[in-house]
């Protein structure tokens, strides 16, 4: 599923193309796309119609549109395959179009989702740590690209856990936006195995992992994110190309760019982890999972 850079690419596109526009009408074309909005399709369409899109915001992987004059946000769940496309209305309807919003700017905002894990929902905005976020996102920590991300405080929280460092990196209540791809890339850059226990790592080593996560996600963002298939696209339907720059993730049996040792794939939390067995020494005894 998309991680921080991919979601930020979408957010920037929405900010560029639809912020300032008002919603003239909304067509709900598949019930699963609004299943998180419990009052139903008519309520969602009714509340959105006439609203002005005042902003496009994000925290970690969570994306939402700020609406005026209401005090609610449109939370967009991209799921595994969700796309937010800004299209001229005369373009043919996409095969997996789930929601279409007609804007007064003359454009369509289209939510396309092949696997139907994503969707739209309205949520009230609440203040958390000096920022307004949807109440459904209130428990999510700041991400490494947030201007108010506190590296030292996050290092302290991470070190206070008794868990594998990769597991903690994936915990969105500790630090948000990092998924499997960028966790593996950050750990490779910091030369730390994902099974290392956080309370056995020094503060500087944990800081190195988080700094590496910042760096790799900034680089991915500059390349439009990581696209492994046609489902990961920006608002214009274009794919990113950071997958060409990955050092560890998905590189099983290929030489480590640093030392030449074959990258190894291991099972972790019902997914795959990729690491260099030489640069990232595994602990003698892997913690029970």
Curated annotation (Swiss-Prot):
Reaction(s) this enzyme catalyzes, per UniProt: Hydrolysis of DNA containing ring-opened 7-methylguanine residues, releasing 2,6-diamino-4-hydroxy-5-(N-methyl)formamidopyrimidine; 2'-deoxyribonucleotide-(2'-deoxyribose 5'-phosphate)-2'-deoxyribonucleotide-DNA = a 3'-end 2'-deoxyribonucleotide-(2,3-dehydro-2,3-deoxyribose 5'-phosphate)-DNA + a 5'-end 5'-phospho-2'-deoxyribonucleoside-DNA + H(+)
Active site: 2 (schiff-base intermediate with dna), 3 (proton donor), 61 (proton donor), 271 (proton donor)
Lyase as UniProt keyword: yes
Positions with a binding annotation for DNA: 96, 115, 161
Entry keywords, A to Z: DNA damage, DNA repair, DNA-binding, Glycosidase, Hydrolase, Lyase, Metal-binding, Multifunctional enzyme, Zinc, Zinc-finger
Listed GO biological process terms: base-excision repair
A molecular-function term among this protein's GO annotations: 8-oxo-7,8-dihydroguanine DNA N-glycosylase activity
Pfam families found in the cross-reference section: Fapy_DNA_glyco (PF01149), H2TH (PF06831), zf-FPG_IleRS (PF06827)
Top-rank taxon, per record: Bacteria
Residue spans, zinc finger FPG-type: 247-281
Enzyme Commission numbers on file: 3.2.2.23, 4.2.99.18
Described purpose of this protein according to its UniProt entry: Involved in base excision repair of DNA damaged by oxidation or by mutagenic agents. Acts as a DNA glycosylase that recognizes and removes damaged bases. Has a preference for oxidized purines, such as 7,8-dihydro-8-oxoguanine (8-oxoG). Has AP (apurinic/apyrimidinic) lyase activity and introduces nicks in the DNA strand. Cleaves the DNA backbone by beta-delta elimination to generate a single-strand break at the site of the removed base with both 3'- and 5'-phosphates.
Quaternary assembly: Monomer.
Family the UniProt entry places it in: Belongs to the FPG family.
Protein name per Swiss-Prot or TrEMBL: Formamidopyrimidine-DNA glycosylase
Species of origin: Rhodococcus opacus (strain B4)
Gene name per UniProt: mutM
